[in-house]
């Protein structure tokens, strides 16, 4: 017998998996967000993957969350979520913060990565906490807007 194989974007496939067997089980509408070196997402509407006209329907990393940003994102726009909520975005935020002031922080003593920033947060490092708050602020903006656009309602049992 012949088995068919389909290939898809990692975030889209993750969203399908969550809908079929995970946190989205039993729901026909959901948004899955993936955070890594970039920010991706899979959007499922009425049980179907939203792929968009050019196959980039779930590229939520390029939602604009900061209209005052002066640096360009890799896509050419400014203020994209990926500039703040990806691993590379967290490093960018940290390097910018370290260059702007002389505050004492363990981040000056090691190569900055998303992991070192969040490890420093666990150690109550004030600079790392500020960076994490900025990360969370922009991720929160995007998630709130995605929830509103998807027609979701807040869960009361959190």
Residue ranges and their predicted role:
Residues 44, 55:
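Short, acidic, Ser/Thr-enriched surface-loop or helix-capping motifs
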Residues 56-69:
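A short, polar/charged loop-to-alpha-helix boundary motif
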Residues 4-9:
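General beta-strand structural signal in soluble alpha/beta enzymes
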């Amino acid at each position: 017998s012949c088995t068919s194989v389909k290939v898809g974007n990692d975030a889209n496939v993750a969203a399908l998996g969550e809908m079929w067997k995970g946190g989205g089980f039993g729901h026909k509408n959901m948004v899955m967000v993936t955070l890594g070196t970039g920010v991706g997402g899979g959007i499922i509407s009425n049980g179907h993957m939203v792929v968009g006209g050019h196959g980039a329907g779930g590229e939520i990393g390029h939602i604009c969350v900061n209209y005052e940003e002066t640096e360009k994102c890799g896509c050419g726009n400014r203020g994209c979520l990926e500039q703040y909520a990806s691993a590379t975005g967290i490093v960018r935020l940290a390097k910018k913060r370290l260059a702007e002031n002389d505050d004492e922080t363990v981040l000056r003593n090691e190569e900055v990565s998303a992991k070192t920033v969040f490890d420093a947060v666990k150690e109550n490092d004030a600079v790392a906490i500020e960076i994490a708050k900025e990360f969370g602020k922009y991720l929160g903006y995007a998630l709130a807007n995605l929830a509103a656009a998807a027609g979701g309602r807040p869960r009361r049992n959190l």
